Amino acid sequence: MAVKIRLKRMGAKRDPFYRIVVSDARSPRDGRFIEQIGYYDPLEEPARISVDEAKARVWLQQGAQMTETVRSLFKKSGVLERLGAERAEERG
């Protein structure tokens, strides 16, 4: 099963917020998901990003792929950098 970490749109018309979810790549954008690992609210100033880094790490170690948008959000919030540093420490 191909698994992706991606955004699921929630909220009202013209008032979106997004859940960061782990889902099967074949399921629809707003359809079924396996697990919610965070959220992103673009309308707040500054945009609010919250990620459960432990869950993200587990899914990435199991082979889940991030979409480009999620990758940029992780990079912006510093999550990607911390996950990379942990991985470098594990390698030695």
UniProtKB/Swiss-Prot annotation:
Q: Which domain of life is it from?
A: Bacteria
This entry's Gene Ontology molecular function terms read:
structural constituent of ribosome
For whether the record's keyword set contains Metal-binding, the answer is: no
GO process terms (BP): translation
What keywords does the record list, in alphabetical order? Ribonucleoprotein, Ribosomal protein
Q: One Pfam family name from the record?
A: Ribosomal_S16
Which first-to-last residue range defines the signal peptide?
Answer: none
State a GO cellular component annotated for this protein.
Answer: small ribosomal subunit
Q: Give the family per the record.
A: Belongs to the bacterial ribosomal protein bS16 family.
Q: What is this protein called?
A: Small ribosomal subunit protein bS16
Q: Which gene encodes it?
A: rpsP
